[in-house]
């Protein structure tokens, strides 16, 4: 039988007498075939057992993972980035985990009149509203701006939202900074309540001055050189206050200055200051347009208040030109090489020598050569004495936002806004 099987493997005809299979040839042919077959069977069994073991481990890991998450969400390292419904998480535990005690800022939700809620814009993590807040005096209401954290948010976003409230609380009150009124963190949704700055941002105001005479508190209003100095002094005072707090702003620009009644300037846009304070300069995610940045920031060096002084010079340029984009002849991608060649902006036709001198002092390449906020205030106070208070600044050309955004290197959508929270 073995020989017959061997003849078949050799494809020998049964009648072929020349095909003779000797005993040793049978061993050479049959034994390897049997070994190969045995090896294939063993390999198949091993693979089957391995796959079965992997499947069992995955099922066990999945089951244990669900048990851990059901028992305690905070014990899992993955919950930091996993999105959850805030309605399923006690707000008190979120406050405890963030180690924030905000009870002294708490405002009763009933004091926010729901019938007065007006949507301003949809933010990245929630909506921003304008509302009326009861002041405690019968019949007297105060207009405020409410930033609400969306119900669907990650634990990190909740921690960040609460951190911004705490940051503003620690910052304290200054007449030239947008003020935190209070918060609602006793239940969902979480609210951050800020003062309402009625006249909007300075950049829009400057553009409107090009079109027509502004009206402020019912009185026709436009812009003079002296008023540019007045706004400059108020922004410099806010910078001096930030310097005392060992902070820097990071994005000084007309778009981040709000105008209140009586022409009071309020510096806003403190998001970068918060991120730097909370997470460090290397972890900042906010993007600042390059044409407002000091050279050291473009070179990725550690920021300081002296970088804000450079940007302050750009702010003066914006005001005296009624909102013209800086470096109009330079593309945003070429701005660093332009500055490295020791170039600065030329004196605008509407700018007097004294103001341009202050601008140039702000644009010193070496940060140590620039004035401090206190020095800046003194220079502005000296220059305002000889400034013009009757000649109205006039720029006949209206601004096209899309063209401005392209030249200035900013997002055109960021220019259309009524309010900035932090």
Predicted regions and their residues:
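Catalytic-loop of the protein kinase fold
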Residues: 239, 243-260
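Activation segment/activation loop of eukaryotic-type protein kinase catalytic domains
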Residues: 255-291
């Amino acid at each position: 039988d073995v020989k017959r099987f061997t003849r078949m493997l050799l494809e020998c005809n049964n009648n072929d007498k020349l095909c003779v299979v000797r005993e040793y040839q049978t061993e050479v042919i049959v034994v390897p075939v049997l070994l190969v077959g045995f090896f294939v069977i063993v390999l198949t069994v091993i693979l089957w057992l391995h796959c079965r073991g992997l499947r069992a481990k995955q099922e066990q890991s999945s089951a244990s993972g669900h048990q851990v998450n059901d028992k305690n969400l905070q014990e899992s390292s993955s919950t930091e980035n996993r999105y959850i419904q805030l309605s399923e998480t006690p707000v008190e535990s979120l406050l405890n985990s963030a180690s924030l005690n905000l009870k002294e800022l708490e405002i009763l939700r009933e004091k926010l009149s729901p019938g007065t809620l007006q949507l301003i814009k949809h933010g990245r993590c929630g909506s921003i509203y304008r509302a009326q807040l009861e002041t405690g005096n019968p019949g007297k209401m105060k207009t405020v701006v409410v930033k609400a954290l969306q119900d669907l948010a990650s634990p990190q976003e909740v921690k960040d939202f609460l951190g911004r409230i705490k940051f503003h609380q620690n910052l304290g009150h200054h007449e030239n900074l947008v003020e935190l009124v209070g918060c609602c963190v006793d239940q969902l949704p979480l609210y951050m309540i800020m003062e309402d700055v009625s006249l909007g941002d300075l950049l829009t105001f400057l553009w409107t001055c090009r079109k027509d005479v502004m009206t402020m508190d019912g009185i026709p209003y436009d812009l003079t050189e002296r008023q540019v100095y007045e706004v400059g002094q108020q922004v410099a005072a806010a910078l001096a206050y930030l310097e005392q707090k060992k902070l820097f702003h990071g994005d000084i620009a007309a778009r981040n200055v709000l105008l209140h009644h009586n022409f009071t300037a309020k510096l806003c846009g403190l998001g970068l200051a918060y991120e730097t304070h909370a997470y460090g300069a290397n972890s900042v995610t906010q993007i600042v347009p390059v044409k407002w940045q000091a050279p050291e920031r473009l070179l990725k060096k550690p920021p300081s208040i002296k970088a804000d002084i450079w940007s302050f010079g750009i702010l003066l340029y914006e005001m005296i030109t009624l909102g013209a984009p800086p470096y109009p002849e330079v593309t945003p991608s070429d701005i660093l090489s332009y500055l490295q060649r020791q170039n600065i902006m030329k004196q605008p036709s509407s700018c007097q020598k004294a103001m341009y001198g202050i601008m140039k002092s702000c644009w010193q390449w070496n940060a140590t050569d620039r004035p401090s906020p206190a020095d800046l205030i003194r220079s502005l106070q000296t220059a305002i004495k000889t400034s013009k208070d009757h000649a109205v600044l006039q720029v006949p050309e209206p601004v096209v936002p899309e063209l401005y955004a392209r030249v200035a290197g900013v997002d055109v959508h960021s220019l259309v806004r009524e309010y900035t929270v932090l």
